[in-house]
Amino acid sequence: MTVLFTDFAMRRPRGPPPERNTNMRNSPLHTPPLGPQLKRWRTLHRVKQSHAAELFGVAQSTISRWEAGIQQMSADERAMAERLLAARLDSAGDHALARLIAGSTARMHLVCDLTHRLLACSPSRAAEFTRPLSTLVGTSLWRYASPEIVRMEAALDPLGWHDRAGPPSVEFATGANASRVVPIRGSTCRWTRMMLSDGSAARLVETL
């Protein structure tokens, strides 16, 4: 199943794209509550709430409130949770997925669903970059997001994107960005969220 976004708000405006600063600070990454993801991580790794509380240096009741969405994490607690939940290629299956993407003829790449760090990339996508792929792998691509991508990211929560292991893919129209390093041109983009072996979430980004 795929969710399509073709309303006016998601379409590229007429005329040339406006100049924009691609600095990430001007387009803050929409950050959903991490409690539900922490709970899935605990379940997968059989970590009790009491042990998670020790890891974070908080009371067990705090872990419970995070997971229930009653209490939000502080900035330091969230940074620790992001390090814990960030996608990484650990298992043979994860690396096989990366090889499939690296060998694909389609324009696609794989990023961490939480941080947008680049995990894998197809040759046709890498050919669009003006920096060597090796210098971009492991870094966040969010700073290169187009305005449409920024809006779509903020629209994921109402879709239950972060609440389920395998939500429907989303397709939307994006305009261009102002980057020469990671250029984005007017096109249709598809995002698919998938779980890696350690329970972290990755996102397959395809240009259709």
Language model features with spans:
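Short, intrinsically disordered or compositionally biased N-terminal tails of bacterial proteins
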Residues: 1-26
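Short alpha-helical DNA-recognition segment
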Residues: 46-64
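DNA major-groove recognition helix of helix-turn-helix/homeodomain DNA-binding modules
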Residues: 72-94
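Short, basic/aromatic recognition patches
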Residues: 90-107
